[in-house]
Amino acid sequence: MVTQILTKMFGTKHDREMKKIQPTVDRINALEPQMAALTDDQLKAKTPEFQERLKKGETVHDILPEAFAVCREASKRVLGMRHYDVQLIGGYVLNRGNIAEMRTGEGKTLVATLPVYLNALTGRGVHVVTVNDYLVRRDAEHMGRLYGWLGLTTGIIVHGLTDQQRKQMYACDITYCTNNELGFDYLRDNMKFDLNDYVQRPHYYAIVDECDSILVDEARTPLIISGPAESSTDKYYAVNQIIPHLKRDVHFTMEEKSKTASLTDAGNAKVEELMGLSNLYDPQNIEILHHVYQGLKAHYLYRLDVEYMIKDGEIVIVDEFTGRLMPGRRWSDGLHQAIEAKEGVEVKSENQTLATITFQNYFRMYEKLSGMTGTADTEAVEFKKIYNLEVNVIPTNRPIQRKDQEDVVYKSEKAKFKAITADIKERMAKGQPILVGTESIEKSEALSAFLRKEGVKHEVLNAKHHEREAEIIAQAGRKGAVTIATNMAGRGTDIMLGGNADMLAKAQVGNDDSPEFAEAVQKIKPQVEAERAEVRSVGGLYIIGTERHESRRIDNQLRGRSGRQGDPGESRFYLSLEDKLMRIFNGERIQKIMEMLNIPEDEPITAKMVTNAIEGAQRKVEGHNFDIRKNLMEYDSVMNAQRNAIYGMRRKVLEGQEIERTTLDWLGDVVSNLLDTHIPEGGKKEEWSLEGLNNSLAQSFGFKIDFATMAVNTETVTDAVKSGVKEVWERQKNSMGPFFEQVQKMILLQSIDHHWKNHLYVIDKLKEGISLRGYAQKDPLIEYKKEAFKAFETLNNTIKSDAIEKVMRVQLVAQQNEQEVLESLRPEEADLDELDYSSPSEADIGHSIPETSEDAPKRKMTFQSGPRDDRPMNREERRRMDKDTKGKR
């Protein structure tokens, strides 16, 4: 009550924010006549003028009103579009580094041009990030005309570009790109051996379109680049054979909500019997237990045509948020292989992580970050806590006319489909367009079959028909059109009442660059306008939701497709007690109420109580998912600090400045460690190991000390070691001559990359088992931090000792020139395009790292340190490492 009174008196937080921005909007509007009076050349000349002012010390905030006014005027002349006042507000919010929540149809793409133009004037590069290649190309092509007219360059980053092309695109003033490509380019850059090969510049400013999808939905799964590990796939087939013999609730239990499975005592015994094992929990059998759990999940939680499809003999993931196919992406941790075994397709080998980052940590690298979406306010707390981004709700240009009806709930899915069909027929009869949203491909196909049986003409938009996505969604607002779409397929394309004249013209003439296209558009426009008026008169676009999503935000996005720019519209959700969300939360309670009231199967419940119960369930799921993402960030923050340290170390080596100083620092650390290990300070002489010290010196530096001829004490031993090491260093330096620094550089990079890769394997294994610490009343996160810190200390020492050993022992072969030496030392780079890339809703791909070419330079260097090399660990070495890691724990 008090809150309501205060809100009436002072307005909401968003109202107060808008009032603060209004004076700036007034200043921009006051400049409009002045800008309109300029010639084209005078308006274009404003860009170099602004750039010069920024160089002289003005800030982007100082020139904001003028720059926005210039951009608005240029947009009128080039695009024929003028920014409304609410769009100026949106641009201001984005420039401030916040999230602008703008309703569907309010022109987010046009809004972005204001802060993009302003910040691109700095010359530091602006990234406009969106969810797929189609939107990247569409927006860059459309808005690139405006930026080009104003003298700025525009680039695009999409799948399939070469490194040279990517570098050129990132060098542009403005770059449109997808979130996945951005993240993978960052990881790939940090796997390269020459700074000139890096494609990205330092991260200055990013505007993330559909930021709720990218920064929230996709934040649960990290981006991973991986290569194949040496491991047999036979175990997947073996485990898959026993899964049908295990009975639910007898041998195992399944938790749909958390997607977990666990064996009962009877299940343990059954698996041991079927696999011929004496004890499933013996250390050597733990891997089999893990694969049994993954097999159970594959059979009972992952469904064909819902979570994945089979295409060309491969398992292809279906994105749970957009319903799109994700070719080339794989689930990790053996789950993808378990599904391959289940479906009888070829099982591809597991992968080893080579580089990884989460979107949470990637986007926090930007100096300034902002986002825009139609639905962000429900996740405002998360945006603030994780990204330090405020959400500002931007008012609509015209009042929203859409009517959102109460949910209706049926006992069965069949009864629900019948009711939906009846509603569709009634609306079609009066010419109202209908968009039906489904949660999965399976549901869209089932409803489509039901409508076909009833003779209802319709279009289906899901991952199976994604090629026609923009065309189908753009015409979903035509008179009497019925479109079934999975979830948020077609997001980013407005549904225009009466249809889209450009799309209709393109369908007629094909090429939108031809003169015939412009003529066709002019002919079609009057009929589109007439049809639009007709559709408005019958209520506008009608949205039918066939199931509530786990997130209220996704439901709001579906509703938001209707009622754009003040158009009329309506929405309603049809639910059944068989729906996933209803089944997991509150379904039994509502079913009891229906039975108590003796409600027939084909009669629905429409009550506020039901809607509230569903929204309560959604809030629980949202809270659970937020906890997962927060937990992921807490774990990844440990990895992020380590990644930054290693990438920083790597970059310092690549820059090549004071490379000798770096090597000498490492040399000092290695020698100190040797002395601390074998003759610890303050230790008794009886505890010293002079023999061990000599063995280490022989291995790392190729010399031994004759302790029999000297008075042995801490000072004399230390001096002898330092003297011997210095002598070896000078000898190496003299023998290598002018390119000793390049040799050091290559060896240091070799060691960093090889041991970082192995460290990632250790961390992966640590994550897998750390949750078990909870059974010992220990906090898994604290334990993880401790273990990861220890592992990183070991990594640091190992990198340095390995690199120093090679630098101090490397020898030239006679007549070997500088280039041959450097080529022999340069690590054999895997083709980065052939590695495996996994991203949210996905994981590792089943390509392989190419074998070394026969024409590649042969190694001509000799390492007296013995048979150490830079290959990945084999399976036996991994087992030993796992054993050592467990022993340390």
Swiss-Prot record:
It holds the Pfam family SecA_DEAD. GO terms for cellular component: cell envelope Sec protein transport complex; cytosol; plasma membrane. It is a peripheral membrane protein. The keyword Cell membrane applies. ATP binds at residues 87, 105-109, 494. One of its GO terms (biological process) is protein targeting. Residues 823-889 are annotated as: Disordered. Its EC number is 7.4.2.8. PROSITE patterns: SECA, SECA_MOTOR_DEAD. InterPro entries: Helicase_ATP-bd, Helicase_C-like, P-loop_NTPase, SecA, SecA_CS, SecA_DEAD, SecA_motor_DEAD, SecA_preprotein_X-link_dom. Residues 867-889 have a biased composition (Basic and acidic residues). It is found in: Cell inner membrane; Cytoplasm. NCBIfam families: PRK12904.1, secA. Part of the Sec protein translocase complex. Interacts with the SecYEG preprotein conducting channel. Has a central role in coupling the hydrolysis of ATP to the transfer of proteins into and across the cell membrane, serving as an ATP-driven molecular motor driving the stepwise translocation of polypeptide chains across the membrane. Belongs to the SecA family. HAMAP family: SecA. This is Protein translocase subunit SecA. The gene is secA.
